[in-house]
Amino acid sequence: MGCGLRKLEDPDDSSPGKIFSTLKRPQVETKTEFAYEYVLLDFTLQASSNPEVIKINSILDIVTKVEDYYLKGYIVGAIHPVIQPVGQRKHLPASCLYRVVLSRLKLSPKNSAAPSGQRRPRLVIEECPLTSEAQTNDAAKELIEKINFAAKRGMKFVGFISQPYSPYKFCNGTNHDGDIESMLHVRHSSDENCRSWNEGTLSGQSSESGIEEELHHESGQYPMEQNGSPSSSKSRKGEASDNKLYTVFNAFDDDSTSWTYQEGILSMKVTRKGSVISTLDADWLELTTFYYKQGLSLIDSFVFWETSKGEHLPKSLEGFFIYEEEGSGVPGSSRKGNDAIVVEQWTVIEGCEIKTDYGPLLHTLAEFGWLLTSVLPTPVLRHDSEGNLATKQIVFLQRPVMWNSAAQTTDKKASRRIKGEDKNKATSRSIGLDTTTPQPAESRHPPEECRLSPSRECWTKEGRLAQHNSFSGFSSSDSVLRELDDGQFDQEDGVTQVTCM
């Protein structure tokens, strides 16, 4: 089933990611009543010579930067750091990059008016200090209580986002607190710093340990402070003395509608090189499908990436997904369930700019009514063959179940509860160093032709497809998503689609 684990030394292993879905490929490309339009904005806490990367001094600045898009009907659907800035990764220039995904409904030819009851919200970002220590149960309970309390006031949860207290300390490897002259020097040389990470001695390496060695060398010249070092357990998201945690909402002026939020299981197996996480294993659909089929939306995730200094390094990571249930008065709240797509994406960073990402795929799926609700960045890093930094991201999309579509049958067994023995039976798939050369994306704007990739069909270095007798994808045909062979996916057996991109 699926791609399985693939040999890292395979010279032709150049897959930029995988796709998992609760649907057959023809159903994925079935047109729905509505489609979406997306805008992807990149922000940085550093100066950048690229005008498309927006400079901010704080996460809070994003609110004013997206106001014009809200006037045009867009809303923020997801916000996330480009890489997961844990451990020495805080010193990477890419740790200062943030992605904001905005969406709005695109009316189909069948409909000439927006759905009734649609209201225009405003973006709100609030600091969210945690009073309890960042342990799974305590943090989950406290965070869920906070966002449920806000939801009663017409605040629709978007996600959590963290920012280092001293961004220049982590983005550039130095601390310029109170030193204006040094700060200006950092702003002037930020692009040079970005290039040095990509054009240094590690250019062309795909070794995780090589990346960590460079980080360790660069950061070793700075003294480590007790409880404030990059490797300290205090750098956990939400609790860190060197991090601020923010909560992002879409706020509505009235509280006539409400949402409720609950947690769900998130457990991942990991492999490490020393203390560094090099691969992650998780069956995303096994963990989430039950909630999707109940009509819930996966909004965000909260993972405890780091352990206290001196503690045993675990072989699994725990956290939780945050799911949203729409209350009365919300348009579309009567729908019975959601189908899902999960994408394991290698995102490539050239200098301080994103070169390859999930944008082209997102614009393609938008035409078929797929809504991006969450992106989980991971600490898994590598260099591609060109020496650019690549990081693994997990992208979650959903669409209401099309009960009346003749092309779709309901998956009866995929909604089983993930608890007890079912949880232990979850099949894991490697999403770590399973590729060597991620393929470059086109523009982050909708491409003229964006093609999905086939299951177990992986790109060769010559750009050809190596067929492994599974379903189709990235093609040159008129259809963006080629049809699957009928016998290769049995929804009644609860088998999920897997695609190598």
Swiss-Prot record:
Entry similarity comment: Belongs to the raftlin family.
Any stretches that span the bilayer, and where are they? none
User: Locations of Basic and acidic residues compositional bias?
Assistant: 410-425, 442-451
Q: Which domain of life is it from?
A: Eukaryota
Q: Where is the composition biased (Polar residues)?
A: 224-233, 427-440
Cell location: Cell membrane
A GO CC term assigned to this protein in UniProt? plasma membrane
- Its recorded name reads Raftlin-2
Q: Give the membrane topology, semicolon-separated if more than one.
A: Lipid-anchor
Which gene is transcribed and translated to give this protein? RFTN2
The UniProt keywords, alphabetically, are:
Cell membrane, Lipoprotein, Membrane, Myristate, Palmitate, Phosphoprotein
Lipid attachment, kind S-palmitoyl cysteine: C3
Q: What positions are modified (Phosphothreonine)?
A: T409
Where Phosphoserine occurs, the residues are: S405, S430
Give the region (Disordered) as residue ranges. Answer: 1-20, 196-238, 407-454
A Pfam family recorded for this sequence: Raftlin
Q: Which species does the entry assign this protein to? A: Pongo abelii
Q: Where is the lipid attached (N-myristoyl glycine)?
A: G2
Function (record text): Upon bacterial lipopolysaccharide stimulation, mediates clathrin-dependent internalization of TLR4 in dendritic cells, resulting in activation of TICAM1-mediated signaling and subsequent IFNB1 production. May regulate B-cell antigen receptor mediated-signaling.
